[in-house]
């Protein structure tokens, strides 16, 4: 119905509205958070991206801007969206706490991590990484990506309280 559609849109814009501001500050912040996740959970990939001047993660921009709409077939996109949005309100395991407040970033990290070996071994420049990442569209298995994303959430959660300490903003994403 129209009212439910409207309020769903309002909720989505509260979550994603910063992605669409003219100065792109919201997207820059998202990419910075993703960069920090890469540094924490995929340090070899982080070092490689640093070496090829790819830490801006612009090759992930489209993923985050349109919430993976151009990366998967529609049925898979809907499953990914459902997982991303329901991760904020997971009640089964976490007594009402969310699994994760930024599941979309863990989905992006899951895609990167699943191709980390190939990227490190065969791609020599930022342009090659960009072309490779864009070539993944409609070639990825959504179930595998979601499983890996969830595992990454738990991996980050398990590091909280250990040395070296996890960045506070990353910590708050998985321990709400």
Give the ranges of each region predicted by the language model.
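Helix-rich, well-folded core regions that mediate interactions or catalysis
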Residues: 1-176
């Amino acid at each position: 119905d129209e009212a439910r559609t409207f309020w769903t849109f309002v909720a989505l814009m509260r979550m994603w509205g910063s992605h669409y501001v003219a100065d792109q500050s919201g997207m820059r912040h998202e990419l910075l958070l993703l960069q920090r996740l890469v540094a924490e959970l995929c340090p070899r990939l982080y070092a490689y991206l640093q070496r090829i001047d790819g830490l801006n993660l612009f090759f992930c921009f489209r993923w985050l801007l349109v919430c993976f709409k151009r990366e998967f077939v529609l049925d898979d996109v809907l499953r990914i969206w459902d997982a991303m949005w329901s991760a904020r309100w997971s009640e089964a395991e976490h007594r009402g706490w969310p699994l994760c407040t930024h599941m979309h970033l863990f989905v992006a990290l899951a895609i990167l991590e699943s191709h980390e070996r190939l990227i490190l071994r065969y791609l020599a420049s930022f342009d090659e990484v960009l072309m490779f990442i864009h070539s993944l569209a409609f070639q990825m298995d959504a179930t595998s990506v979601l499983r890996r994303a969830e595992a990454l959430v738990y991996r980050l959660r398990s590091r909280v309280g250990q040395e070296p300490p996890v960045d506070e903003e990353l910590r708050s994403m998985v321990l709400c």
